[in-house]
UniProtKB/Swiss-Prot annotation:
Signal peptide: none annotated. This is UPF0342 protein CTC_01059. HAMAP family: UPF0342. It comes from the Bacteria. Belongs to the UPF0342 family.
Length: 116
């Protein structure tokens, strides 16, 4: 079996794994409601702002933190959005693990940074 056959085999297994099925199903439900999509978009924007603030100031502003907590509480009460975010998180763990396994198999340092 060649590399591409194995890649297709992995794709088939991935397609049917419970975490991917759940992400797919919750994604469909999310797309059925514009308010949920807007809530998710707003949450993502706030997450980005918090990340940016943390990078530049080493701390998230009180205002951003309050907004995140407020929207997070609202999302926690919205089953569709919270289920989607949970499914996305579970999938992200699997995806990161797969990428790590593949990177370890390739075993090539592509950073080209000088090491001191």
């Amino acid at each position: 079996m060649n590399l591409y056959d194995k890649a297709h085999e992995l794709a088939r297994v991935l397609k049917d794994c419970p975490e991917v099925v759940e992400l797919r199903n919750t994604s469909v439900k999310m797309k059925e409601n514009e308010d949920n999509l807007k809530m998710l978009k707003d949450f993502r924007q706030l997450q980005y702002e918090a990340y940016y603030e943390q990078l530049n100031n080493e701390k998230i502003s009180e205002e951003t933190e309050t907004k995140l907590n407020k929207l997070g509480s609202i999302i926690a009460m919205n089953k569709t959005v919270s289920n989607y975010l949970e499914a996305e998180s579970r999938f992200a763990v699997i995806w990161e693990d797969l990428i790590k396994i593949l990177n370890e198999a390739v075993d090539v340092d592509l950073s080209f940074e000088s090491k001191k």
